[in-house]
Amino acid sequence: VTRALVTFGVTGMEELLELAQPGLREYADRHGYTLLTEPPLALTRPPSWHKITVLLEALDEYDEALWVDCDVMIADSTLDLADEIPAESWQAITAHHTPEGEVPSAGVWYLRQPMQPVLEAIWRLDGYLHFKWWEQGALQELLGYTPHELPVHLERETELYRRTHWLGLEWHTLGFPGRPLDPGARVVHCAPGNPISVRAQLMRDLTPALKGA
């Protein structure tokens, strides 16, 4: 099985990618992934949407792909996320329990070949082009969730939902300034939704602790 670890940083987020990259490279080398960090050639939509295009390209060349946002840090690389995913699953993601409901998140997103037509379907749902969660709203709709109806909840179980493996939050822990890091965290999403400078500072603050893990 060939696997790619995919991310990119554009429109001011290059610094975040630079901070994340050492941990991503160590994880990729340890578990046999090819690290892909090239941005899309042209931004025709808000940047977050272009994870769809780069993942389609990755799945043309590799059997499986792991996407992580560029403000994600690897806290513990000893285990490979892929080992937890059942063979029958098409994808693996987390759902975060938030004041806005149960929100599936693509900040850490594992995909297999059957996800190619799903990615194409997400791209076609351009009614979410400027939605607050960007392409994640389209993914949530295809899963059977209600991104436009708060609190977000599962309305119906779709085929995609049944083919989804729900990761434990240790694989996508949300980290924020002033909040202790969960000692079981393996992958930390650093202050998502905050200004780039806040995310970068948290990533810099976490780096010494993660190196000592």
Write out the residue ranges for each language-model feature.
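N-terminal anchoring/stem segment of glycosyltransferases
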Residues: 1-62, 208-213
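Generic beta-sheet signal
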Residues: 3, 65, 92, 186-188
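Structured loops at beta-to-helix junctions and adjacent beta-edge loops in soluble globular domains
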Residues: 8, 95-96, 112, 170, ...
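Anionic group-transfer/hydrolysis microenvironments
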Residues: 9, 69-73, 191
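Short, glycine/charged-enriched secondary-structure capping and boundary segments
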Residues: 20-21, 80-83, 203
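A structural signal for short, well-ordered beta-strand segments and their strand-loop junctions
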Residues: 36-37, 66-69, 92-93, 152, ...
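GT-A fold catalytic core of metal-dependent nucleotide-sugar glycosyltransferases
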Residues: 42-43, 47-119
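Catalytic core and acceptor-binding pocket of nucleotide-sugar-dependent glycosyltransferases
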Residues: 49, 53, 116-213
